[in-house]
Amino acid sequence: MQKQDPSFGKGCYVDSTPLPNDIDNNPFNALCCHGVSSSEIMTRLVLVLDEKSGLPVWYDIIPGNVLDINTVMTIVNDVAGTLGIEIDSLVLDAGYVSKELIGAFHIGTEKTIIGRMPARKGYPYKTLYWEVKDLIGKGKYAFVRKHHAYFGIKKKITLFENPIYAYIYVDQYNALKRFSDYLVEHEDEFDELKVRDKDWYTVKYGYFVLVSNIDATPKELLSEYFCRTEIEVVFKTAKEYLDLLPLSKWTDATVRGKILHDIIDTTAVLLLRKSMRQSGLSTSEIIGRCQSLMCCRKKDGTITVETPSKQVKEYYGLLGLSVPAHVKEDTCKKEIGLKM
């Protein structure tokens, strides 16, 4: 990919998702805590996506539910050491934003980040709302993205003794819709609230804050952040392939091999979907039509390929491919990088 685009992998989205953990002796499972009242055995798949193409650059399997600066820097260093790709920008979810992360990535540091501010103690999440409350609804701060009207404003703040930009947003469509739903179900509860709290509830369900060391407009930064939704598509695709191995197969080597196989499958499906986007055809339909060509190998290594139907030829044509009548085994292995 870097031969085609030298910038591939330099700007990345990083996120993680829980893997199936129903098997007790999964070697990567670890006990992790969720708040004060629950704990769970968990393994997480960490994915790094190229921000331009949306394709996986790197993945790792981590025990438990560790989402911190060490995880991020380990990923950055592994990608640099193994692939020679220096990641220079990161888009992270709230689980990664911490005091240590802000200390490593703030205004003036070389690498850039965008992260979602957690709504928990130690972060000025609601404080920022009260600071800009009277500006919400003003046309000066309004913009539209994908049919949703947003309020957005940027403030330079100090977070954990480091300078950072806070981008404060209200998705006014979501805020109004979900506030209306809340009122229908909790009208009596709402009536009991203080006036100040009632004001907060009118925006609560559309309010969020992004932190970044990038100096941009609120609209520009939000577009950059929302591109990370690509990673959710990849996770959804990946989970369609990440089926559980048989109980007897759960070893370090087999789990790593299974995940590698599934990431390759995921990448292939994503590339196929990207190529098919304008065709109006589903990926499953094309795979179903094209996967059943029979092949016969002769003693001299020549592989004869079944003659495809007219419709199958058309499907291959959508990918810019033609079906050869014959293939040399040695040539084919070299083309796909297999050792002879």
PLM features: what roles do these ranges have?
Residues 1-340:
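Anion-binding and metal-coordination hotspots
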